[in-house]
Amino acid sequence: MTKLIEFKHVQKKYDGKYVIDDLNLAIKKGEIFVLVGPSGSGKTTTLKMINGLSKPSAGDIYFKGKSLNEYNLQKMRWNMGCVLQQIALFPTMTVKQNIEVIPEMLGWEKQKRADRVDELLQKVGLSPDIYRDRMPRELSGGEQQRIGIIRAIAASPDVILMDEPFSALDPISRNSLQELVLSLHEELGTTIVFVTHNMEEAIKLGDRIAFMKDGEIIQCDTPEQLLMNPKNDYVRHFFDEPKQTKEWRVEDLVVNGYFLNEIPENARQQVCFDTPMKEVYSLLSVYPSIVIVEKQRSIGSLTSKEIFAFLSREEEGNENI
């Protein structure tokens, strides 16, 4: 597979300290490449060096076989989509205007831009007639991030850079957007470089994962190889961490009183006590409410509100341990 991005002996120094040290890395065209590791490991710095927002102190970075030093960086960035944790939609622009930003800079005709906006909104399940003229403040966090994603792919860039884009979202929105990224990648084949500190997210999304610590890549491999053959105990512990957390089920919600006694008339989708929370996330990203069934009897219902309340309580409990 062709190399799209390559780091050769790259170093980055801040205040006399190396935050990236002798980084050698090749990212292949068409893959989802995930940078993962603890806070301060150099993930975001590495990502920022790809589009020239941060310049290396030594070494060289190549994009499509050419050193970044040879590019007009502004024009090069038009060929790199970007999705951030902060969402960063322009607040005074409509959804349509936000999506059109790069195509307009590239000189696309008005009708071509309008057609592209409608095509992309439909692709992510947002009705163009309802959403194209809305302002960002009128959207939920998940809807804003969907717009952020399609804005990044609007001009069909060679690569999309994603810096912890879903970390501020609730579990249901996060799961839904992860599925969206996988679906769009399968359809479009665009190279994605994705930064996260979440092991489960890295394993779910990545074709390859680079595990970073103290500015160095400790191991770069497929998710399967990282899980089966971690290079050292530190990597093993890091990737074992998600397995050590309790896998919540519907029963945990019911026992703790986090459900509704009434059942909405339009609620048809059912779950039982043994249904894992991950499956509940997926269902609630599609249906507004789901029915809890135990021993062939409907005992209540769930919405995202009950899930958030339960998870918030558990998070507070863990912080107090």
PLM region descriptions:
Residues 111-130:
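Conserved ABC ATPase "signature" region
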Residues 220-221, 229, 301:
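ABC ATPase "signature
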Residues 214-215:
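Conserved ABC ATPase "signature" C-loop
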Residues 154-158:
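A short, proline-enriched helix->beta-strand linker immediately N-terminal to the Walker B motif
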Residues 59-67, 76:
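Conserved ABC transporter NBD signature motif
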Residues 51:
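Helix-to-loop junction immediately C-terminal to a conserved catalytic motif
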Residues 135-139, 143:
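Conserved ABC ATPase signature
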